[in-house]
Structures are given as structure tokens and as C-alpha cells.
């Protein structure tokens, strides 16, 4: 049994990386002593009993301006608790994790939760990715594509990098799920932010609505673009077709109401919403964006991969599925083609092997 630290910016934030970190902490605690080290805390939450939790600072401060101060405090905790391995969750805390472990025997695993092709976070983020690639003992990417990008762009050697996806909680028996081929509803799940490509989604929706006004399209998720998107939907007279549902609780339980899932993102890490859709036997149509869709969707077998950001091609594929019930059923029946590698036991096996050998 090893003592494993999980370093995060804000463990109680509501993002995907934080959700993954919580699940990982609970599961890894079955074979290790887990210490969650949260630099900051946006809100107070009751923590699971499986792991130890510590907050470094009461108020959020700039990592860039306070790097030495923050790293020194983290290092003190690592030494006092004799941590063996430190998982650094996201590039944002790479500088802290690497500096805090310098001069210690703590092994570091940098866990990338975005991808190298996403340049929207700016040069500082790219620099932090470089820090992890250069100085961490092991780099873990979400996809094989990103693994290859790290090897090419940062010259990371094969023995220092692993591709370990996030797992998907499959509480359903696929045999028990009945696909509703009569449904006339499309679903998109994702934060209302620019990276999710809602500008293109609106273009697509306008084309599809002209041909199939008897269908509807629901967008599940909240975010900074809510008001802007609401206004544009009214402007394009799409209120009856396109619906902003906001954040939906127990989202995994409503997929079965829909005919298929659409994703228009510019970038992803590993889109869990697509995996959730497949677990619920939904066909998927997605732009072939970096990274994830091409590793989840078997093109022309359980969905369509569309040339990046080609709204007309996306609309054509959506209309094709709407007009072809047999195709929807065929895609639904093959929804599980790539699911096995995302099952919890498969992913945890990789994590436990990595931690035991490092």
C-alpha cells in the first residue's frame, strides 16, 4: 500500500476534472492511503470517508505570484505525511506539484485533462503543460491521440507516458435498455461556453429545423453564454425547436428519452457525455475535434464523425438520421463497440498498475 497524494486547484469546484479526481480518490483508496490536497476551496463540502482531505489556503491567491509560498506549504505536507506518489490533476497546478516535490523522493504523475491541440487557454497554460511533460516522472493523457502529441511536441519518451481514459459509471445493463426509435428529440450535453461550439450548433439547428420542424433539440448545461444563446435562439426564431434546459440533475437518467446525441465542440479532453449517450444506446453525431470523439465513435457504425466545424455537413448527417429510422436502430444496436476500455475495472487496473510500479 502506497501513500498517494492527489493535488488539485479546488477539489470542491464543479468541473469535470474535479469530479474525476473525487471518483479516483475513492476508488484508489481501496488499495492505497489517499491524501487529497486542495490548494483552495470555493465552497465547503462534506468529504468522503475513504480519503484524507486538506485545504492549503482559506482564500484563493495567484499561483504565479505566490508559487514559492504555495509550493513550500505543499512540500511540508508531503514530507510530514510521507507521501510516496503525487498525482497532479491538470496542468494548472503543475508548477506547484513539481516544485513541491523537488529534492524529495515523491514520484510525480501529471494528469492532463485537456489536450495539447487546445490552444484557447493561452501561452501560460501551454508552458504549464511543458513543465509537466519535462519534469514529472510520468505523464497521463486521456486519449491515445494526445499521448502521441505529447511525444511529438515535448519529446516525452514512451516509458514516461501512459494513456488512461476517464471511466464511465455504467449502472445499467445494456440488455435492459430499450432504445426509443420513435423519439423525435435530439440532445446535446455540455457547458454553455465558446469551446463547446454553440455558434456552429445554431447554424446547424437552423438548417435542420427548416426541414424537420416536428423535431426538437435540447441543450443540457449551464454557463456564461446562457443569455447570449437565449437571445440568438429568439433572433433566429428557433424557440420551438432549440431549448436551453440548464444544468440537469441525474443527467444520465434522461438520455433514454432522446433519439440521438450531437456534439459541436471545438476541443474536448475526453467527452464523457458521449460515453453516457452510448451507455444509453444513443447514436452520436460529432465533429471530429481533438480529442476523444474519434476514439469513442465507430464512424458509420454507431454514429457519424463530421469534418471539423462544417455546419452544413453536420446538418446533412442529422437530417440523414432523422429520415432513416432503420439507421438509428442499427447505430443504437452497435453503441457498445468501444465501451469496454472505458469500464471502471479496466481503467482502475491501469491506475493501480501505474502507481504500484512507479
Describe the role of every protein-language-model region.
Residues 7-65, 151, 163:
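N-terminal strand-loop element at the rim of the active site
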Residues 65-72, 107, 116-135:
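Nucleotide-sugar donor phosphate/pyrophosphate-binding loop at the beta->alpha transition
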Residues 298-300, 304-311, 320-326, 340:
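Conserved acidic donor-binding segment of nucleotide-sugar-dependent glycosyltransferases
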Residues 15-23, 184, 188-210, 224-230, ...:
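A conserved mid-protein helix/loop that constitutes part of the nucleotide-sugar donor-binding site
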Residues 247, 266:
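Aromatic "clamp/platform" in nucleotide-sugar-dependent glycosyltransferases that forms part
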Residues 136-161, 168-170:
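A short, active-site helix/loop in glycosyltransferases that binds the activated sugar's phosphate group
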Amino acid at each position: 500500500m502506497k501513500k498517494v497524494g492527489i493535488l488539485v486547484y479546488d477539489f470542491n469546484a464543479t468541473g469535470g476534472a474535479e469530479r474525476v479526481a473525487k471518483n479516483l480518490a475513492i476508488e484508489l483508496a481501496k488499495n492505497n492511503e489517499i491524501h487529497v490536497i486542495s490548494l483552495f476551496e470555493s465552497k465547503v463540502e462534506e468529504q468522503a470517508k475513504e480519503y484524507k482531505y486538506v485545504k492549503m489556503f482559506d482564500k484563493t491567491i495567484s499561483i504565479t505570484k505566490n508559487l514559492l509560498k504555495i509550493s513550500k506549504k505543499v512540500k511540508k505536507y508531503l514530507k510530514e505525511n510521507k507521501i510516496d506518489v503525487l498525482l497532479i490533476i491538470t496542468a494548472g497546478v503543475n508548477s506547484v506539484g513539481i516544485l513541491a516535490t523537488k529534492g524529495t523522493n515523491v514520484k510525480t504523475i501529471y494528469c492532463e485533462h485537456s489536450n495539447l491541440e487546445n490552444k484557447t487557454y493561452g501561452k501560460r497554460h501551454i508552458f504549464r503543460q511543458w513543465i509537466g511533460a519535462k519534469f514529472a516522472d510520468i505523464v497521463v493523457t486521456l486519449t491515445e491521440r494526445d499521448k502521441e502529441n505529447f511525444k511529438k511536441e515535448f519529446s516525452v519518451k514512451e516509458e514516461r507516458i501512459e494513456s488512461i481514459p476517464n471511466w464511465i459509471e455504467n449502472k445499467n445493463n445494456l440488455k435492459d435498455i430499450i432504445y426509443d426509435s420513435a423519439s423525435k428529440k435530439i440532445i446535446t450535453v455540455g457547458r454553455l461556453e465558446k469551446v463547446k461550439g454553440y455558434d456552429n450548433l445554431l447554424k446547424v439547428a437552423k438548417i435542420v429545423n427548416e426541414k424537420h420542424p416536428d423535431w426538437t433539440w435540447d441543450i443540457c448545461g449551464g454557463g456564461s453564454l446562457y443569455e447570449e444563446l437565449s437571445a440568438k435562439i429568439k433572433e433566429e426564431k428557433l424557440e420551438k425547436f432549440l431549448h436551453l434546459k440548464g444544468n440537469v440533475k441525474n443527467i444520465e437518467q434522461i438520455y433514454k428519452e432522446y433519439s440521438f446525441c450531437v456534439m459541436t465542440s471545438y476541443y474536448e479532453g475526453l467527452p464523457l457525455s458521449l460515453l453516457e449517450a452510448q451507455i444509453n444506446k444513443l447514436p452520436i453525431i460529432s465533429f471530429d475535434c481533438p480529442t476523444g470523439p474519434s476514439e469513442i465513435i465507430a464512424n458509420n457504425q454507431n454514429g457519424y464523425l463530421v469534418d471539423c466545424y462544417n455546419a452544413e455537413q453536420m446538418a446533412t448527417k442529422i437530417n440523414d438520421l432523422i429520415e432513416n429510422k432503420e439507421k438509428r436502430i442499427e447505430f443504437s444496436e452497435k453503441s457498445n463497440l468501444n465501451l469496454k476500455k472505458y469500464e471502471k475495472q479496466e481503467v482502475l487496473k491501469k491506475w493501480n498498475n501505474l502507481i504500484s510500479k512507479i
